[in-house]
Structures are given as structure tokens and as C-alpha cells.
Amino acid sequence: MQNLCYQLKVIPAFNSNIYRLLELDGSCTFAALSDLILDAFEFNHDHLYMFSLGRKPYDPNGIYSPGGRAEKRADRVRLQDVAPVKRNKYLYLYDFGDEWIFYLSLIHI
């Protein structure tokens, strides 16, 4: 299977005037995507996180950071595993205490 390149636009909920464009291979795990987002916004890598494919914080069907009890672990699920579709929107929640929320949009495959 050929790995496709995905372009994501990441907008922090705390400041919608800024964004980052990330390009990554479809074989990239959600754990690696978390690292890319944190690096792009200069955050430390010291809290738990989750991704929601339906933009719902604490989504029971979400993809959670490794080490928890979630069925879908971010270090095991790849971007291409969730059958991303152009213009799909996702939520990334970092730090369950401070709840830093980022909105992700798939803008190009």
C-alpha cells in the first residue's frame, strides 16, 4: 500500500488568528502527530492527550495517548487507519487539566 502525504491545518482554540500547516505521511501515528503539533506550537511533551474524529473532547471513541486504558492508542493508530477524507475536521486535546484544544482540518491528500 502506497503511503499518501496528508496536509493538516492546525488552529488553536485559544487563538484562532494563528495556525500551522503540517505535512505528514499516512503511516504517521497519532502519537507522532501529537509530537508535531506540540513542537509546532512550542509546547512541552509532558501531559496526556487525545484526538477526537468527531470534535468531542473526551470522546469515548477517541484516540488516546499511550499508557491509558483506551482501546485506540495513539502509538498504534496511524493517520491512514482512520480513512481520512479531505476537509474532515478533528479535535486534539492536550493536557486534561488545562485542556488546550486544537482544531485540525485535513486540507490536502
How should these model regions be labeled?
Residues 16-31:
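Short, contiguous acidic and Ser/Thr-rich linear segments
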Residues 41-57:
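Short loop-to-beta-strand transition segments
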Residues 29-43:
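Short amphipathic, charge-patterned alpha-helical segments
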Residues 107-109:
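Conserved small/polar residues in nucleotide/adenosyl-binding loops
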Residues 2-20:
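Eukaryote-biased recognition of intrinsically disordered, low-complexity regulatory segments
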Residues 97-103:
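Short coil-to-beta-strand transition motifs
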Residues 4-6, 84-91:
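Short, hydrophobic/aromatic-rich segments at coil-to-beta transitions
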Residues 60-88:
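Eukaryotic mixed-charge, acidic/polar low-complexity intrinsically disordered regions
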